[in-house]
Amino acid sequence: MLQMPKLNEIPPGRGGPGEPWGEGRWAGPTGPEAARPARGARGQARGARARWDSWEHSRLPTHPGPGWDQCSPSFLCAPSSQKLIMESKDEVSDSDSGIILQSGPDSPVSPMKELTNAVRKQQRALEARLEACLEELRRLCLREAELTGTLPAEYPLKPGEKAPKVRRRIGAAYKLDEWALHREDPLSSLERQLALQLQITEAARRLCAEENLSRQARRQRKHAALQEEKKLRDLQRCLGDRRRNSEPPPTTVPSLGRELSASDDSSLSDGLLLEEEDSQAPKPPPESPAPPSRPLPPQSLEGLQPTGPESGGQERAPIQNSPWKETSLDHPYEKPRKSSELSSESSSPATTPQDQPNPSSLWVLDAASYHVVPIRNVPGQRQGRTSAPATPEMQGRRGQSQSLRVDSFRAGAEGRGRSAFPRRRPTHYTVTVPDSCFTPGKPPLPHPACHSCSEDSGSDVSSISHPTSPGSSSPDISFLRPLCLPEPPRHRGAWGPACGRELAPHYSKLLLPAGYFPTGRYVMVAEGHLPPGEWELCRAAVGAAYDEEGAPLRYQRLVPSHSRIVRTPSLKDSPAGRGLSKAAVSEELKWWHERARLRSSRPHSLDRQGAFRVRSLPPGRESFGRASGPRTQVPPVYVLRRSTDGAPVQVFVPENGEIISQV
């Protein structure tokens, strides 16, 4: 057995660094009396040791020995309330008990002390890092408080510390969206929950379908799958109810909005039929749209396949119903066109300036006998620009309703927007004009213009339609009654822009040449029975229509008109065309040959305001058309006063609002 030394004995090898190993180490008296002189002798031999009074207190020597400079104190003095941390490898002793301890590699307490020191060092590092993070958080919270004026709740407070008062910085005042910060859209929340529930339900089904399961596990998984499917159905039902409740009630405004978003290729008769259906029955919700009585025409040349009724409303038209912008004038004429451009090329955004009201308003004339004025489109129109033929209206809808579709009149720059109503591509039409337009006693009233929007409608003023006869796919035109306005100074005639294809009777049996109607953008406004040589070209702004009381004419029921536009491929197809005189036919042929002789190339686009190419003007009228090149534009002027010989003395330019007088 190992013999442990007694308390007051010095173990072997502990005699000090100056004592050699020998036989007499264990000999001699033992006890505190013998150990104390030995320790004193070792202290005197070293001379560099501090003199110890007790275990916890030490004093530096009053007279350091010669080896004091090379030695350093090996003990740390701590307060009496803390333990002494021993960091020296040398031996220490307790003067009271006589215990001699050594902190060396062979000591059993050394690994524990080292671990304690390492843990305490790591703790101090973590505390420093935490303090740095808290300081950064305080700084960020103070910056946020300077912007919002409110100290965030995340501001870290020390024990006993009060929250600082922060005032909002000048120039940082703004209002946060409380709804976006503290609330969320219930529909989006339900949609997210539904998407998550779909995944959970699918996972539960896969777990239930696994093989090699015990009967109890299979039963539990099947029950869980049924519960998830029930939650999924509840979410779907709740989402459907919320969507139905959030939609606005069906009114007449949504029906008009659907017509406004229709494509430019849709025909006017189709749009009017949809309007009548919407006025008779409320609009169903978008989730389950009711199919109309007949399908809509194709929205583009590419999609000639059957489409649903929502294709016109869901998909935007090739040309949106946006206000006209000046940047559209920068596009070149010979630009290669895509299919969407081909399908909406003839709808021009800037052909009907409505900047100010004008006496040349719309008219309604009583119907009587008629003269046939065949009007043709420009021969240079592309074949690919024609849309699908309009579907004839049903027989049962004849005479049910006559609607006047009038958008709100816009003034200023907003008056240049695109027409929000459907447009029809140019085709061959014959216009029947009542004889009441031409009273036998005096020339017609100023600017009696037939109003029709059956073709390219570039205006937001109005679109008038009446039920057509069987076999006719074109809507009727109506004539508005003339107003009791003072007659302006009479002039010989003027060309003016129309709301879509406006066709005016020139005189009783005159056939207009096709070159004077470039895709229905201009109209001859005649004031007397004048030969074509006396015609003049100018632009007259068409103002808002007014009724007899002077109020703007917006929505009213018109009396059934007996005049209409019918589709006629040639003159012989029209019954009234057979009675035309040979002189009228010869006049038309003469003008046709004149155009063919002087024609060099056809205009490619009429998207510019006033882009009307003047091929030939009568003698003496060349000043109105600036025929300076292949793209001559007619200046938009309105003749206010003339001299006795017929020369214009005072003209009005609607484009910039100037009145030009000749001195």
Swiss-Prot record:
Name the Gene Ontology biological process terms. Answer: adherens junction maintenance; innate immune response; intestinal epithelial structure maintenance; nucleotide-binding oligomerization domain containing 2 signaling pathway; pattern recognition receptor signaling pathway; positive regulation of canonical NF-kappaB signal transduction; positive regulation of cytokine production involved in immune response; positive regulation of interleukin-1 beta production
Sections of the chain in a coiled coil: 117-147
Q: Where is the composition biased (Pro residues)?
A: 282-298
Where in this protein would one find the motif Nuclear localization signal (NLS) 2, according to its record?
A: 332-338
Q: Please state the protein's primary subcellular location.
A: nucleus
Motif placement: Nuclear localization signal (NLS) 3? 422-428
Comp. bias (Basic and acidic residues): 50-59, 225-246, 327-340
Instruction: Name the segments for region: Disordered.
Output: 1-73, 219-363, 375-405, 448-483
What keywords is this UniProt entry annotated with?
Coiled coil, Cytoplasm, Immunity, Innate immunity, Nucleus
As annotated in the record, motif Nuclear localization signal (NLS) 1 runs over 164-170
The UniProt transmembrane annotation reads: none
Family matches, as Pfam families: CUPID
| Function field | Expressed in peripheral macrophages and intestinal myeloid-derived cells, is required for optimal PRR (pattern recognition receptor)-induced signaling, cytokine secretion, and bacterial clearance. Upon stimulation of a broad range of PRRs (pattern recognition receptor) such as NOD2 or TLR2, TLR3, TLR4, TLR5, TLR7 and TLR9, associates with YWHAQ/14-3-3T, which in turn leads to the recruitment and activation of MAP kinases and NF-kappa-B signaling complexes that amplifies PRR-induced downstream signals and cytokine secretion.
Q: What is this protein called?
A: Innate immunity activator protein
Q: Which gene encodes it?
A: Inava
